[in-house]
Design a protein with these regions (language model features):
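Positively charged n-region of N-terminal signal peptides that target proteins for export
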Residues: 1-4
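Bacterial N-terminal signal peptides
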Residues: 7-15
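Boundary at the C-terminal end of the N-terminal hydrophobic targeting segment
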Residues: 18-20
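Short aromatic-glycine motifs in intrinsically disordered, low-complexity regions
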Residues: 26-39, 227-233
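Mature N-terminal segment immediately following signal peptide/propeptide cleavage
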Residues: 35-51
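Functional-site microenvironments in short loops/helix caps that host divalent-cation chemistry
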Residues: 50, 54-59, 63-76, 114-310, ...
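Acidic-aromatic/histidine active-site loop/patch
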Residues: 100
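Short, structured beta-strand segments at or near domain termini in extracellular proteins/domains
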Residues: 319-329
Length: 329
């Protein structure tokens, strides 16, 4: 895999993915959320790439079963196929990091918003329990309390897709610009940043310890009684890590692999790739689940692959899911 200097890569909208080097750094944007709280974004150039897995579902399952002693079935990866060409026709801004607790706190203070875990007929969220038998929705958990220590520099968790949409609408109204979740295609394009390997760090899952926070030796040592499929290396964190602690990809984005799953705008469609349009796909017109990408601190290494997909109901919230925002240029 060719290595590119961060900030020196420009993706050209040509047949296949093409690159040329430039001395100009990526264009950044600092959005003022109020009270001195900033949200940094990076401009992604328009371009095209191959979306989905470059290896068969059978090969993916066989690799992880052999390498980590799993018992995974190929069907788990079928929705990553067929791999297909996608063209992102317009530049867009995307958050450099996950939205943090501090940034989300500013939204709540300014708007008075109550999250799905704090209202409704089914309040509460999933939180970390020392006894895995206690795992389940509990009213004591919300974005304010995930069951483990977090500072305002950590990614916010226990936010539903609905909560994230409310954040984007608030910011759009506040700034007079269109803030939103990235589409699934935009997310994978931003994550890959020109790479074609399982991760932007390469094909070896052990390289994740340098670029992201996933289920690892640190988590396994902390929870020896739990059966996690972990990498052998250590990323240094049991739970979530403060944003920006690992190496970014060539576009300048941090934590695209691991830390927290990221909500995307799309409805989930298991067979959508077979009919996906070339230009700016936005997913199925309707559905029951929304897409998440990127894996998490408690997720096995296969979930952190650039092509991996997850789905949850829009009201779901967990200690493993968060988001980053996009803005139309």
């Amino acid at each position: 895999m060719r290595n590119f200097a961060i900030g020196y890569v420009v993706l050209l909208a040509m047949s296949g993915t093409a690159f040329s080097e430039t001395k100009e750094p990526p264009k950044k944007l600092a959005v003022d959320l109020g009270k001195g709280v900033k949200l940094e974004m990076v401009l992604i150039p328009a371009g095209d790439f191959k979306m989905g897995s470059g290896e068969s579902a059978e090969a993916t399952a066989a690799f992880f079963n052999k390498t980590y002693g799993g018992d995974l079935e190929a069907g788990l990866f079928k929705d990553e196929h067929p791999q297909h060409r996608v063209r992102i026709t317009k530049p867009l801004y995307l958050g450099t990091h996950h939205v943090t607790r501090g940034q989300f706190r500013q939204f709540v203070k300014d708007s008075g918003y109550k999250t799905d875990s704090e209202k409704g007929e089914n309040p509460g969220a999933y939180g970390w329990e020392s006894d895995p038998k206690e795992f389940g929705i509990n009213e004591k958990y919300s974005w304010r309390n995930a069951g483990f220590e977090q500072t305002d520099e950590h990614p916010v968790v226990n936010v539903s897709w609905n909560d994230v949409e409310a954040f984007c609408k608030w910011l759009s109204k506040k700034e007079g610009k269109t803030y939103r979740l990235p589409t699934e295609a935009e997310w994978e394009y931003a994550c890959r940043a020109g790479t074609t390997t399982r991760y932007y760090s390469g094909d070896d899952p052990e390289t994740l310890a340098k670029v992201g926070n996933v289920a690892d030796a640190t988590l396994k040592a902390k929870t020896p009684d739990r059966k996690y499929l972990t990498i052998k290396a250590s990323d240094g964190y049991v739970f979530t890590a403060p944003v920006g602690n690992f190496k970014p990809n060539a576009f300048g984005f941090y934590d695209m692999h691991g830390n927290v799953w990221e909500w995307c705008a799309d409805w989930y469609g298991a067979e959508y790739y077979a009919t996906s349009p070339l230009d700016d796909p936005t997913g199925p017109d309707s559905g029951t689940d929304r897409v998440l990408r990127g894996g998490s601190w408690v997720g096995w290494p296969g979930h952190a692959r650039s092509a991996a997909r997850l789905r949850y109901w829009p009201v779901d919230r967990g200690y493993y899911s968060g988001f980053r925002v996009a803005r139309t240029q």
